[in-house]
Amino acid sequence: MATNYIFVTGGVVSSLGKGIAAASLASILEARGLNVTIMKLDPYINVDPGTMSPTQHGEVFVTQDGAETDLDLGHYERFIRSKMSKANNFTSGKIYSEVLRKERRGDYLGATIQVIPHITNEIKERVIEGGKGRDVVIVEVGGTVGDIESLPFLEALRQLAVDVGREKTLFMHLTLVPYIPTAGEVKTKPTQHSVKELLSIGIQPDVLICRSDRAIPSNERKKIALFCNVPERAVISLKDVDSIYRIPELLKSQGLDTFVCDRFRLDCPEADLSEWEQVLYRQANPTGEVTIGMVGKYVELPDAYKSVNEALKHAGLTNRLTVNIKYIDSQDIETKGVELLHGLDAILVPGGFGYRGVEGKIRTAQYARENKIPYLGICLGMQIALIEYARNVAGLTQANSSEFDKDCPQPVVGLITEWQDESGNVETRSDESDLGGTMRLGAQQCHLIEGTKAREVYGAETIVERHRHRYEVNNTLLPQIEAAGLKVSGLSADRKLVEIIEIPNHPWFIAAQFHPEFTSTPRDGHPLFAGFVKAAKDYQDSHKA
């Protein structure tokens, strides 16, 4: 079967939820038995989001093969079974870098390099390559129609529609239909102007997804269809909902998947969304609730921890609990004290970089350890737990990470200078290495030690989890820390790197160097988060007055 392409654009304003809409449509098509993947094209000049500020861009989502990508790829993986890869996300920076590399190499035989055709051809090649072997590829273009940055991408997709044939392509445009309280009605003019903007660059949308805080009335949908040159059945009302996992059914109920299949002449069975119905049932019928404190450095923007937030909610679904997340700035722990941690059922310290707020995180780990509160540390959250234990239990009072103090006399955490990737290839790094794209990234095998809490939680001897770090436990000082009671419960495949630590005489204190949040989904959850949330409920029950 030839590959079919759905191109998703956004208009009027940003943050309308193109990624959620694209992922929801993909989940319906997948439920109809189609082989679907989703790509994200980002117009910014950064090569990838790996070195971008989390408070500006949100989290960096890491794929199985180690790509540092946009957080929308996390949405994609949470909605469909297909895993993302390096081919599923690329930026203007990556495209321009590749074109310039080819020019320096002489690939263009002395031609004058221009946006058209060289940049647009590179974009088209990557879209086609990323969609090979798929029935449907959904391609989301970041930004808003009218932005100068996205013009090369839109032009490339316009050309691609001509190249592969309009019968194999569909343009889906998300737009805002605002409700004006003083007028008591929704207004379609912004949508009309957004479509006009698309038409000016040669793109006629085939489907309009109309975002609003309420359902769009039938007469307004007819008006949009008339003025925007689309069939009325292709004007989809997408109102605000209490759960993003309700959107697949909302789109299906309006026949979007049927419209797509008719357009591409795909003969496939009706979508079975019973798994999503189960997710929504568990979400709507909890048997209790827990409050988990997330102590981080980027809490002013919750999207900086998007996958962690979602993984906690998924664990709530697994345990039939509502998970309330209390965000606490680790710097506030330094200035206001651990009183901010009172009343929590569990504590989670997520990943991060740099020294700011680290001492607050260390005090948080100490508070959780001493008060027997369930603790989950992720990446930096593991490293600070190790530092705390080394200082306050193992007698290494000057323990620190060389990331925070290069002259530290007791560096219990240091730069990884050499490791093996999943394929057995040796990677090396030094202090002089670039920051971008040089970390230990992607899926790595982890061996779990028998008799440990981690082994019990996972129920397996070997697991595969995704990493994103350049510092690790210093094995030279590890024996002294282990002698004081800390347990290493997970090691890398070559047994050289510490992956998980835990405290045996604590009800639930586990910290991992990897990022388990990247593989959690609403339908399946994740064993580590599920165990953590269950421990939070057990702690709550044992401390009831």
Curated annotation (Swiss-Prot):
Enzyme Commission code: 6.3.4.2
Activity regulation as described: Allosterically activated by GTP, when glutamine is the substrate; GTP has no effect on the reaction when ammonia is the substrate. The allosteric effector GTP functions by stabilizing the protein conformation that binds the tetrahedral intermediate(s) formed during glutamine hydrolysis. Inhibited by the product CTP, via allosteric rather than competitive inhibition.
InterPro entries: Class_I_gatase-like, CTP_synthase, CTP_synthase_N, GATASE, GATase1_CTP_Synthase, P-loop_NTPase
Active site feature: C379 (nucleophile), H515, E517
Disulfide bonds: none
Further details from the record: CTPSs have evolved a hybrid strategy for distinguishing between UTP and CTP. The overlapping regions of the product feedback inhibitory and substrate sites recognize a common feature in both compounds, the triphosphate moiety. To differentiate isosteric substrate and product pyrimidine rings, an additional pocket far from the expected kinase/ligase catalytic site, specifically recognizes the cytosine and ribose portions of the product inhibitor.
Chain sites annotated for binding CTP: S14, D147, I148, E149, K187, T188, K189, P190, T191, Q192, K223
Enzyme class, UniProt record, top EC level: ligase
Pfam families: CTP_synth_N, GATase
SUPFAM superfamilies (UniProt xref): Class I glutamine amidotransferase-like, P-loop containing nucleoside triphosphate hydrolases
GO CC terms of this entry: cytosol
Organism per entry: Actinobacillus pleuropneumoniae serotype 3 (strain JL03)
Annotated region (Amidoligase domain), positions in chain: 1-266
Gene3D superfamilies: 3.40.50.880, P-loop containing nucleotide triphosphate hydrolases
Binding partners and assembly: Homotetramer.
Function statement: Catalyzes the ATP-dependent amination of UTP to CTP with either L-glutamine or ammonia as the source of nitrogen. Regulates intracellular CTP levels through interactions with the four ribonucleotide triphosphates.
Name of the protein: CTP synthase
Pathway the protein acts in: Pyrimidine metabolism; CTP biosynthesis via de novo pathway; CTP from UDP: step 2/2
